[in-house]
Swiss-Prot record:
Function comment: Essential for the assembly of the photosystem I (PSI) complex. May act as a chaperone-like factor to guide the assembly of the PSI subunits.
InterPro entries listed in its UniProt record: PSI_Ycf3_assembly, TPR-like_helical_dom_sf, TPR_rpt, Ycf3/AcsC/BcsC/TPR_MFPF
Gene Ontology terms: biological process: photosynthesis
TPR repeats: 35-68, 72-105, 120-153
Keyword Thylakoid attached: yes
UniProt KW keywords: Chloroplast, Membrane, Photosynthesis, Plastid, Repeat, Thylakoid, TPR repeat
Protein name, as recorded: Photosystem I assembly protein Ycf3
One Gene Ontology cellular component: chloroplast thylakoid membrane
Family the UniProt entry places it in: Belongs to the Ycf3 family.
Lineage of the species this protein comes from: Eukaryota, Viridiplantae, Streptophyta, Embryophyta, Tracheophyta
Organism in which the protein naturally occurs: Panax ginseng (Korean ginseng)
Topological type in the membrane: Peripheral membrane protein
SUPFAM superfamilies attached to this UniProt entry: TPR-like (SSF48452)
């Protein structure tokens, strides 16, 4: 049974109903409809913390989806799961892959910056200030890209860039 039929959350049910109506009226191929169903089920599982199920759905959606823009969001969500699981190297890989298909994903740049900043903090705790600075510099570059795409967002990152004199 598709996940959309078993979800008890009102907002998810509403989204599923609207998505199903749109799938019926918008001209799409059966493959595109099936890919979207897997994507939607992946989002639902992810929102409930069922990451293994979400990944299965996302991988199936990736197998079926041909549109690069749509694939970018699937890859981004896979990156989110790996981030949540502390698998930062894998997460970065998926964010990069998402950005290759859609370079206008500020949230991917932000998440990459957060991971780099975290790694910089880890390097400081390990007493390696040179490595920490390299990670912080990389975080700064990603945050600048995110802010360029969405001016006015990422205020905390903007403040960090100013405080650390990384803002140009």
């Amino acid at each position: 049974m598709p996940r959309s039929r078993i979800n008890g959350n009102f907002i998810d049910k509403t989204f599923s109903i609207v998505a199903n109506i749109l799938l019926r009226i918008i001209p799409t191929t059966s493959g595109e409809k099936e890919a979207f169903t897997y994507y939607r089920d992946g989002m639902s599982a992810q929102s409930e913390g069922n990451y293994a199920e979400a990944l299965q759905n996302y991988y199936e959606a990736m197998r079926l989806e041909i549109d690069p823009y749509d694939r970018s969001y699937i890859l981004y969500n896979i990156g989110l799961i790996h981030t949540s699981n502390g698998e930062h190297t894998k997460a970065l890989e998926y964010y990069f892959r998402a950005l290759e298909r859609n370079p206008f994903l500020p949230q991917a740049f932000n998440n990459m910056a957060v991971i780099c900043h975290y790694r910089g903090e880890q390097a400081i705790r390990q007493g390696d200030s040179e490595i920490a600075e390299a990670w912080f510099d990389q975080a700064a570059e990603y945050w600048k890209q995110a802010m360029a795409l969405t001016p006015g967002n990422y205020i905390e990152a903007h403040n960090w860039l100013k405080i650390t004199r990384r803002f140009e």
